[in-house]
Design a protein with these regions (language model features):
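C-terminal outer-membrane/trafficking sorting elements
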Residues: 311-353
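Intrinsic disorder/low-complexity segments enriched in polar/small residues
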Residues: 5, 32, 183, 321-323, ...
Length: 353
């Protein structure tokens, strides 16, 4: 079986490597298809324009939530393409951030990149997401910009503050010089534009930064807060983020909802420079590449091909964390069961446990 066919089959099966045991999983232990809500790695696509039609096929949505929309045909299809990235990553999504673009809309400036709101086929109180990201050489970070993340309910963004506990969002941002933060909209936030949470583990590690010319891996875990009574949510919602295999954010005092009907129910591929004013805009065309968009109800390996480092009871900073991060990577397998190396294989599944 050719690598291209294997990878296409893998994408169709929504497969990712992950583990669920509190102990390190044995080699070959893989996340089952039922755990994975969505998986898109673009190996099923030919090189060329990636528009709304392709996005609708790949980013599967549920049949009852009509809030989904796709905006991947910006600037006559020039913003969104599948490109070949080499043997390790294969086909990936390349988004263009044109000179002068600010915000998600067209208005009087070129439209930035692309947008997808994906109502998930499964909802949960706890959900994981992950993707790989590559800022191409010459990318201008300027004052900052938005990156994909999870949200739920009304998915508050922009200058709409959640005041009735009916929605939240936890997108990612790059800030000046590529500094990485989580932009969270929640009950009690200080800013009308959401609150920044730095990826520095509450000041205990150096601030994480996106750099150009390097593939980074982002893994997010969002857990809904409990409800004391309808309309009265507890302040124990939790957002955790791993950056290139290291825990960079762990905040567990969030009031994300006031009703237990509000879940993690959408993946929001929202990306653009801004802000809204001209000083946020790039002075030349810039590009970001994306791969392996994953949403799962079960844990996701924070390093490609590595055992899970975030099993229940061990995902906070503690004595076990560094030992687990330094553990020998799990073996990766092709669909036919043979041992392989390389990134795409790390996301293929050996079906069953």
């Amino acid at each position: 079986m050719s690598a291209k066919i294997r990878n296409t089959f893998s994408a169709a099966m929504f497969a990712v490597t992950a583990t669920t045991s509190a102990a390190l999983a044995p080699a070959g232990y893989a996340q089952t298809v039922s755990d994975t809500v969505s998986f898109v790695n673009f190996e099923n696509r030919e090189v060329g324009v990636y528009g709304n039609a392709e996005a609708k096929e790949d980013f599967k949505r549920n049949d009852y939530d009509k809030s989904w929309w796709y905006a991947m045909d910006k600037n006559n299809g020039e913003n969104s393409k599948v490109v070949y990235d080499g043997e390790e990553h294969g086909n990936v999504l390349q988004l263009k951030y044109p000179k002068g673009c600010v915000g998600p809309n067209d208005n009087d400036t070129p439209a930035c990149a692309g947008q997808i709101i994906q109502p998930l086929v499964k909802t949960a109180d706890t959900m994981w997401s992950a993707y790989d990201i590559f800022f191409e050489d010459g990318f201008e970070f300027q004052l900052g910009g938005k990156l994909p993340g999870l949200c739920g309910g009304k998915c508050y963004t922009g200058n709409a503050m959640p005041e009735t506990g009916d929605g939240w969002s936890a997108r990612i941002m790059w800030r000046k010089d590529g500094n990485a933060v989580q932009l969270i909209y929640f009950m009690g936030q200080e800013s009308v534009y959401g609150d920044d949470f730095k990826w520095d583990l509450n000041g205990t590690i150096p601030q994480k930064q996106f750099t150009t010319g390097t593939w980074h891996r982002i893994v997010n875990k969002v857990s809904m807060n409990t409800i004391a009574s309808p309309g009265n949510g507890d302040k124990n919602g939790r957002v955790q983020t791993w950056f290139d295999g290291e825990l960079a954010l762990d905040v567990d005092t969030l009031r994300l909802r006031d009703y237990d009907t509000v879940k993690v129910d959408k993946f929001y591929l929202s990306t653009f420079h801004g802000g809204s004013s001209a000083e946020w805009a790039p002075t030349h065309d810039c590009f970001i590449r994306y791969d392996n968009f994953t949403v799962s109800t079960d844990s996701i390996a924070v390093k490609a091909g590595a055992p899970d480092t975030t099993a229940p009871g061990t995902d906070r900073i503690g004595a076990q964390r560094q030992d687990r991060l330094n553990a020998t990577p799990a073996k990766a397998y092709r669909i036919d069961g043979s041992r392989v190396g390389g990134k795409k294989a790390n996301y293929e599944v050996k079906v069953g446990r």
